[in-house]
């Protein structure tokens, strides 16, 4: 249920956006 940006990416508390590259695994939170 992510928008097309990393709005809900709070790795590892939340999963990464399924339709985007998992950049939140590198510490990105937006």
From Swiss-Prot:
Keyword Methyltransferase: no
Predominant location category: secreted
Tissue spec: Expressed by the venom gland.
Subcellular localization, as worded in the UniProt entry: Secreted
InterPro entries: Spidertoxin
UniProt GO MF annotations: calcium channel regulator activity; ion channel inhibitor activity; toxin activity
Alphabetical list of Pfam families matching this protein: Toxin_9
Disulfide bonds: 2-17, 9-22
Top-level lineage group: Eukaryota
Keyword annotations: Calcium channel impairing toxin, Disulfide bond, Ion channel impairing toxin, Knottin, Neurotoxin, Secreted, Toxin, Voltage-gated calcium channel impairing toxin
GO cellular component terms, A-Z: extracellular region
Function noted in UniProt: Antagonist of L-type calcium channels (Cav1/CACNA1).
Family from the record: Belongs to the neurotoxin 02 (plectoxin) family.
Domain notes: The presence of a 'disulfide through disulfide knot' structurally defines this protein as a knottin.
Protein name as annotated: U10-ctenitoxin-Co1b
